[in-house]
Amino acid sequence: MLETAVRPRQAIDVAATLNSDMERVWALTQDPAKHARWDVRFGRITPTGEGRFRYRRFGVGGTGEHSGDRWAADGSATSALRFACRNPLSPIERGSGYWRYTPREGGGVTFVTWYDYRSRYPMIDRFFRPLMAWGTAWSFDRLRLWADRDVPPEFSASIALADAAIRAGAVIAAVLMLDGPSRWAAAVALTILAIRVPALPWAPSARRTSWSVGSVR
């Protein structure tokens, strides 16, 4: 069993199904430069030697340590790490987790992550942790688009931004163009529709993955 740096509390669990082979998925996730391109949680990942690295996002940096890989006879693999941040601007104090790669019958890989962390600000974490889970799930689908369809992460993020802008624009237009009670009724209806309509095929979507908060392993 993998060692963890903290006891499970409200761990985050995300799984995505990719059609790419193990070699490609491993390359896109284990290379720090490639990892930073698809994972919205990181702006930059810099190796510092002996399995250690520094990461930065929105001007807040932390450190991490790769704590080992395990390969099973069935071809599956698990990669574990620990991470920490001393910056008081970060809600995350320290944590640990792993990635698991499981080959699928007929081809492809099921890519899973499980991680937990100690929050610096428990009250804020009630909102921050679900956001982290959603961001991880969104990033996993962004990885899928890159691995399976050769859609660069930067391009898929641009498509997602444009998609969100169109949805928001439709709601705003309804508020500005209509009068009376119908204005707000239309705005509510369009907001619900904007949330429910599936994302464009080239835009990442957390809905295409399975994710949860509160997993214990």
Q: At which residue positions do the language-model features occur?
A:
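Terminal "cap-and-tail" regions of soluble proteins that handle hydrophobic small molecules
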Residues: 2-5, 104-217
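Terminal, regulation- and interaction-focused segments at domain boundaries
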Residues: 2-24
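Charged, solvent-exposed alpha-helical segments that act as regulatory interaction surfaces
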Residues: 14, 38-41, 145-152
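Amphipathic alpha-helical segments
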Residues: 18-39
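Hydrophobic-ligand binding "helix-grip"
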Residues: 36, 40-47, 51, 56-108, ...
